């Protein structure tokens, strides 16, 4: 890393990019970047840190810069192109992360689902017991002086995580996603195996994932889960409307009893992964148990609020497995309320590839609404629509429009979950405004 130069982030509002920018800023490096004008939830942290966000413009690029290119941008992007013409260093997000994790005990969290929640939980817990830097995919990042640990999210998309050589890796699951890049599940597993082979001390994987069980590695692989053949096991699990409680064993050794203020089976597993890696690093488990109690969650992962008589949940879920986990968590916390799902399909390629799985997961809700498909920067149209998905859903499937959220007014004292990785929040805000205005009129 070069403290004399300015790090310029192309696409600085991206979830990982904003976190990385904050870390470099905390470490004393000069940081600024560019992005679209549209407000994103990652922006607040950058603004609070005093990091400038400029519109895309080749004139932003100066001689004293190192350019960090966001994963969505190629060499034809105007600033990246200008940097190459000027002979400046242009490096990717993963390459930059790899540079800053070398001085610590690094823990990379990978998985098709759950990596942001797990890395956020691990960062919170370890920060409470030892100096810890972290880079989480919800836009949060912190560079702590003399950190013992560095927790970071390792993204499999386009094999970005093969740039990393962490001390430890947590792998929550392997699933077929990103069909615009991966050809099949074997292709995905091959990517994870590459990361496994580059991990230096140990790997922690969910034991019930048959693809993770097939991984080859040069270091010990520890399985965590609820089955008798798992190395780290959660037993005597009690799920209530306040959270979950469970005992943890490492083989036949009792490690401790833990309470978590979180919902859904997936959060028990995420917590178990955190307990496992901290145990192997000989961190006091009483301290771990104490820190687990205070975790408030990560941004856009089961974020709750109450408006009028409704519970509104915002969640990043955009894959069938994530939708299932989110609805399961809502049912645990609100067993006596109807669960209404409002889902924004994310990318045409994913909607086509997982159409039946989406319909099955969404049908776990009591009523389902859809929005139009949110296309990625790499695709502008496709041969599928939300109406096509809606026809396969047994409990609704009506497509909502932003200027008419009134169908949701049929529900009272229930739970509405807005799910998606695009701009689903604008639908949520439109619904909240509608509810608030009605409440004012009725009072």
Curated annotation (Swiss-Prot):
One of its GO terms (cellular component) is cytoplasm. It holds the Pfam family Mur_ligase_C. It is found in: Cytoplasm. GO terms for biological process: cell division; cell wall organization; peptidoglycan biosynthetic process; regulation of cell shape. Keywords: ATP-binding, Cell cycle, Cell division, Cell shape, Cell wall biogenesis/degradation, Cytoplasm, Ligase, Nucleotide-binding, Peptidoglycan synthesis. Pathway: Cell wall biogenesis; peptidoglycan biosynthesis. One of its GO terms (molecular function) is ATP binding. This is UDP-N-acetylmuramate--L-alanine ligase. It comes from Ligilactobacillus salivarius (strain UCC118) (Lactobacillus salivarius). The lineage of its organism: Bacteria, Bacillati, Bacillota, Bacilli, Lactobacillales.
């Amino acid at each position: 890393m070069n403290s004399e130069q300015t790090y310029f982030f192309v696409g600085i509002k991206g979830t990982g990019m904003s976190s990385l920018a904050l870390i470099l800023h905390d470490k004393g490096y000069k940081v600024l970047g560019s992005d679209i004008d549209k407000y994103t939830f990652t922006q607040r942290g950058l603004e609070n840190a005093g990091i400038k966000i400029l519109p895309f413009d080749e004139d932003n690029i100066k001689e004293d810069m190192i350019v960090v290119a966001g994963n969505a941008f190629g060499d034809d992007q105007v600033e990246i192109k200008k940097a190459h013409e000027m002979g400046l260093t242009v490096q990717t997000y993963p390459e930059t992360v790899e540079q800053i994790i070398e001085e610590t005990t690094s823990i990379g969290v990978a998985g098709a689902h759950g990596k942001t929640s797990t890395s956020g939980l691990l960062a919170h817990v370890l920060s409470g017991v030892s100096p810890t830097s972290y880079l989480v995919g919800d836009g949060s990042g912190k560079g702590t002086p003399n950190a013992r640990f560095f927790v970071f999210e390792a993204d499999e998309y386009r094999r970005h995580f093969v740039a990393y050589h962490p001390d430890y890796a947590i792998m929550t699951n392997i699933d077929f996603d990103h069909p615009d890049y991966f050809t099949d599940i074997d292709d995905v597993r091959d990517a994870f195996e590459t990361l496994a082979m580059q991990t230096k001390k140990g790997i922690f994987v969910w034991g019930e994932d048959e693809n993770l069980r097939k991984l080859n590695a040069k270091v010990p692989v520890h399985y965590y889960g609820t089955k008798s053949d798992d190395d780290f096991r959660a037993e005597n699990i009690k799920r209530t409307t306040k959270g979950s409680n469970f005992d943890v064993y490492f083989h036949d050794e009792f490690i401790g009893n833990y309470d978590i203020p979180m919902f859904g089976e997936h959060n028990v597993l995420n917590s178990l992964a955190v307990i496992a890696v901290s145990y192997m690093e000989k961190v006091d488990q009483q301290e771990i148990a104490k820190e687990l109690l205070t975790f408030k969650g990560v941004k856009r992962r089961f974020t709750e609020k109450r408006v009028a008589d409704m519970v509104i949940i915002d969640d990043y879920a955009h894959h069938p497995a994530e939708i299932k986990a989110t609805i399961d968590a809502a049912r645990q916390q609100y067993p006596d309320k109807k669960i209404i799902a409002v889902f924004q399909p994310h990318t045409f390629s994913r909607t086509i590839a997982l159409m039946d799985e989406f319909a099955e997961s969404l049908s776990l809700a009591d009523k389902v609404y859809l929005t139009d498909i949110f296309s990625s920067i790499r695709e502008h149209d496709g041969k599928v629509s939300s109406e096509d998905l809606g026809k396969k859903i047994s409990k609704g499937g009506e497509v909502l429009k932003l200027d008419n959220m009134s169908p949701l007014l049929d529900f009272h004292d229930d739970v509405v979950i807005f799910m998606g990785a695009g701009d689903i929040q604008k639908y949520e805000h439109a619904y909240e405004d509608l509810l608030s205005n009605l409440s004012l009129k009725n009072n």
